[in-house]
Amino acid sequence: MSGKERTEENGAVKQDTKEQVKKSADNGDKGVDEVDFAKIGLEDAFKYLNCSEHGLSGAEAEARLKQHGPNKLPDNSRNPVLVYFGYMWNPLAWAMEAAAIIAIALVDGADFALIVGLLIINATISFVEESNADKAIKALSAALAPKAMALRNGAMVTIDAVDLVPGDVILIRIGNVVPADVKLLPEHGADDYETPVQIDQAALTGESLPAKKFTGNVAFSGSTVKQGERHAVVYATGVNTFFGRAAALISGTHNVANIQRVMNRIGGLCLITIGVWVVIEVPVQFAHYKHSCVAGKEGCPTLLNMLVILVGAIPIAMPTVLSVTLALGAYKLAREGAIVTRMSAVEEMAGLDVLCSDKTGTLTLNKLSIDPSNVFPVGTMDIPEVMKFGALSANIITEEPIDMVLWESYPEREKLKSEYKHTKYFPFNPNDKITIATVLEIATGRVFRVLKGSPQVVLAKAWNAQALDGPVNEKIKEYAGRGFRSLGIAMAEGDGKDGTKWEMLAVLPMFDPPRHDTKETIERCMKQGIAVKMVTGDHLLIGKETAKMLGMGTEMYPSEVLIKARNGDVEAPHGYKNYVAMVEACNGFAQVFPEHKFEIVEILQEAHHRVGMTGDGVNDAPALKKAHVGVAVADATDAARGAADIVLTEPGLSTIVTAVIGARKIFKRMTTYAKYTISVTFRIAFTFGLLTVIYDWYFPTILIVILAVFNDGAMIALSKDRVVASVLPSTWNLATIFVPGFVYAMWLTLSSWALYQVATHSTFFERMTPLPSLNTQHATLISWCEDEISSKLGVNPQDSLCTYPSYADQLNECKGSVSLSSQVPGVPTILDQCVTEQRYIRDALTRALIYTHLSVSGQAVVFVVRTSGFSLKEVAGVSTYVAFALAQFGATMFGIFGLGGYNKPRQNFDNCQFCDYSTHNRVLFFNSEVEPRAGTESVYTASVIGCGGYVIVAWIWAALFYTALDPLKWGLMWIMNDDGFRDRHAWRKSNHEAMERRSREQLDNKEFAGPSGMVPANFSNPLGRASMSKPVSALLDRKSASLVAINRSSMTVSHDPNHALNIGRRSMIGRPSGPLGRNSNTGQSNPLNSSSVEIKPDAPNKV
C-alpha cells in the first residue's frame, strides 16, 4: 500500500468519525476510552490525547500517571486468608481432619486439640516460608520488569513500561513486546513508500502470521514486534488496553506441576496403607480380642487406637517441606543469576541432559572487535574509507553490538555526527540478515544508502556479484578458519527510488573471543551428564573453530543438512541411521535460523531427551517454549523473556550450569524428604498395626502427634541441607522412592518389634542393666508379684485385697459387715491386683521407650537417604544437625519424664502400691494418683510414664539397627541402578580390568596393536604414551635432540641440549610422576614431563 493510498483511506474514515471525535473531546478524558483510535487520523489522535509527536514533559507524565494509574493489570493476588486455609485443603489434610473429627466424637479433647494444632502449625509454616520466598523472588525479578524507550523532555530515555501514560511517544523495535496500545507515527524520512512494521498478534487475535502495520495503524499491548522499528504514540494503558479489557474474559489454565503429581501419588499410597490396616485391625480387635465400644469419654478405645495409624501414616508435612524446598531453592537460583518464571521448571532443569546453546554472548563474550589491517576491500575504496562507511551504516541509538563496534572502530566518528544524518533506517531481522541506512550528507545534500549484513546476502545484492563470488567466499572461509565472523558492507547512491545498484565495498573480520570460563564450564557439563550442542547462525567454519577452542568437538553440520535429512534425503545424515541419531551425536549446527532451533529441540525430544535451549531474540520464542527448559540469556528481548522458563541476569554458560547444578540440589533435597517420609509413615503404620494385631497393645495418639510436630517440623531444615548434586540428570522415578522407603520402613519396623519383644517378653534388660523389668508375660508377673508380696508384705498373695489396709478403705465390698477374710466374693486377690498394676505400669514405661526409639531411629533415616555414600562420612548441613538434635532432645525428655500417666483408667484406685515396686519410686499420674483396677484392663486407655534410663537403651538400639541401613541402601541402589550406581561401579571395574590386562600383555611381550607412537596403557602410564615407556633421564641424555617445552600459547625451543637437559632434570626433582603427569601429592601438573616433550632435530625458534 502506497503512502498516497493510505492517506486517502484515512481521509475517508476521518469524516465518518468527526462527530464521534467532537463528542468525545467534549467529554474530556472519558473520550479517550471511547474513541476508536484505529479509525481516526494521527492529527485527531494527538488532539484527543493533548500531546504532540515530541512526547511529554516529565511533570506532565507524572500528572497523567496519577490520573490514569500505572500501566499494568490489577494484581491477581489471592486473599491471604484463603491462601492460608488452602494449605488445609488437600487429601493429606483431609485425613488429618477426619482424625480430628473422630477424636472429638469420642470426647477426646486432648487429641483433638493436638491434631488441629498440628494442622495449624503446618499451614503457618507453609504460608510464612512460601510468602517470604515469593516476596524475595519478586524483588529480584524487579530488574526484569519490561522497559520502554519514551520521548520525555525532548530526549529518548528508557523507563519502566509500568510508568507509561497516554500521550507518551515511544520507540518499538524488533524483539519488543508492545507495552501499551499505540498508534504508529510516520517513518522518519518516508515519502511515497514506507517499510511496514511486522507485529505478531497471535496471542491476542489468533492470527497465525505477523500483521503488517503502517502509519496510523494501531498495535495492541502484549503483541510482539517481529520486524522493523517505529515511533508510536500511546493511547491506552493498563486495564484500558485491548488486552486489559479481554483479560477479565480469559480463564487461565491450571497446570499441575510434576511435584504435585508426585505428592498425590505418595499421599494416595499412604491412604491405601491406612485403609488396609484399618480393615485388618477393626475386625481383629472386636472379634478376636472382644473389645467393646460404648458412648462417652474413652468409651471406644479401639477407635482411639485407629487414630495412631490415621495420624502417624499421613505425611502431613510433605506439601510444606517440598513446596518450601522448591520456593527457597528458586530464591537461591535467583540470587545466583537465574530467575525462575515457572516453578516446575526447577524440576525439569534438574533432569536436563542436552543443552543447546547460542554461541554469541553465551559461549563467547559478545565483545566484537575489528582489526582494520585485516579488512578485505573488494572495490576501489581504501580501508579508512571502508571503515567510514561501516560507521555510517551503524544505528548507535539502539546500541546493538555490531553497530557499536563499527562506530567505535572509526577514529573520526565524532565528525560524522555533524557531517551526516540518517534519514531512514531499515533494522536487522533474522530473515533478511541485513540493515540499510539512508544517509544525507548535510554539506552537499548528497543521499546514499549503506548496507551491512551477512556477506553472502550482501554479495548477492552487488551488481558484480558473479565476479566477486570467488574471492569473497575464499576470504569468508579464511576468516572462518581463523575464528572470525564476516560482515559485508555495500553502498548505493540515492535513496533507492531510482533503482541504483549496490556496490560491495569490503568484507570485515570480526572476532568474538570465547569467555574465559566457557571451556571449563563445558567440561563441568560433560561431567554432569549434559551434552552441550552449539547452535549458531555463524558460518560452519567459525562454529567449528570456536568449538575446537572450547574442546566441544567439531562434528558440526550446516542447518540445511538437518532439513534435508528430515525431508527424507538418505545421504544427508552423514552415515548415521537417521536424522535423530545424527542430531544426538553431533556437537552442533551452524548457519541456523530461528525456525531450525525449534526443529532441533523437537528432534531431541523425539529421542526422549530433556532439552534446554538458550535464546535472546524474538524468533527464538517458539524454540524456548518448545524446550523443556527455555533459557533467556542476559539482555534478551522482551519476547524471549516472556517465552522462557529461566531468565538469566548474568551472561555466559556458567550461569546456566550453576542453575542446573542448583536445580539438582533442590531435586535431591525433595527426593531425600520423599524417601524419608515414605519410610517413616510406612514404619508407623506397620509397627503399630502389627503390635496391635499380635499383642493387643495400645499406643496413645498424643505421642504420634508430638512425633509429627518434632520430627516433621524439623524436616523443614532439609530445604537448606548441604547436598551433593547428582552426577546424572535427575528425574522423578517413583520406584526409586517407594521401594527404598518401603524397605527402610520394614527394617525399622523389625527393629521396633524386636525392641518390644525383648523388653516385654524376656528378662534381658533387667539382667544386663540395673533398670526395672518391663516383662509383661503373665507367668513372669505372677512369679514376680508372689515374691514381692511375700517378701515385702509378709501376707498370702491369694488373700483378698480387703486384707490389705490401703485398699480396704476404698472398696465398698470390703466395708460394713464383710469380714476381712482371705477370700471375699467379687473382690480380687492381692496377687491379681499386683499383676494388673504391674502390667499397667510396665506397658506405660514401654510406651515411653518405644516412643523414644521411634523418634530417634525414624529421623536418623534422613542421614542415610540424603546421600549415596557412607552416611556418617557425608557431612550434612548445620541446620539439619541442629534440627535433629533439637527434635531428639525433646523426644528424649518425653521419654525420660513421660506424661504423668497421660490418661487415668476408667476404674481406678487412689494409689498404686504395686507400681512402686517396679519403678522404685512414687508414680505421679495425670491430675491425681490413680491406678487401674484388676479385671478392667480392656477398658482403660494407654498411659505413658517416663522410662528414665531406658532412653539410653532406645538410643543404643537405634544405633545398632542404623548400621545396617547404609549396606541396605547400597544394595538397593545396585539392584535399581539408582543414580547410575551400578553403571559407575561397572565402568570402574571394567576399566581396572582392562588396564591390568594391558599391563600383563606388555609383560608377556605381546605385540601391541595400538596407534603408532603409543604403547599399552598401564597404571603408571594410563594414556599409553610411548615417551613414558623409557626413563626420563635416558630421553634427556640424547644430546643430538632439541627439547621442546610445550605450553598453551606457544612451543618454545631450546637449541642448547645441556640447557634443555638441566631444565628438564630440574623440573623433575621431587615430582614423582603420577597419572597424566601430575604430582601424586599435590595433584598439580608438572611444567615439563614426558607427556609434554617432543624431540625435533631441526626445530625453529618458534612454532
Curated annotation (Swiss-Prot):
GO terms for cellular component: plasma membrane. It is found in: Cell membrane. The chain crosses the membrane at residues 80-100, 101-121, 154-174, 232-252, 266-286, 306-326, 643-663, 690-710, 734-754, 845-865, 881-901, 944-964. It holds the Pfam family Cation_ATPase_N. Disulfide bonds: none annotated. It comes from the Eukaryota. Mg(2+) binds at residues 616, 620. Coiled coil: none annotated. Its EC number is 7.1.2.1. Residues 1-32, 1054-1103 are annotated as: Disordered. The active site is at residue 358. Residues 1078-1093 have a biased composition (Polar residues). SMART domains: Cation_ATPase_N. The keyword Cell membrane applies. Signal peptide: none annotated. It is a multi-pass membrane protein. One of its GO terms (molecular function) is metal ion binding. One of its GO terms (biological process) is proton export across plasma membrane. It catalyses: ATP + H2O + H(+)(in) = ADP + phosphate + 2 H(+)(out). The plasma membrane ATPase of plants and fungi is a hydrogen ion pump. The proton gradient it generates drives the active transport of nutrients by H(+)-symport. The resulting external acidification and/or internal alkinization may mediate growth responses. This is Plasma membrane ATPase. It comes from Dunaliella acidophila.
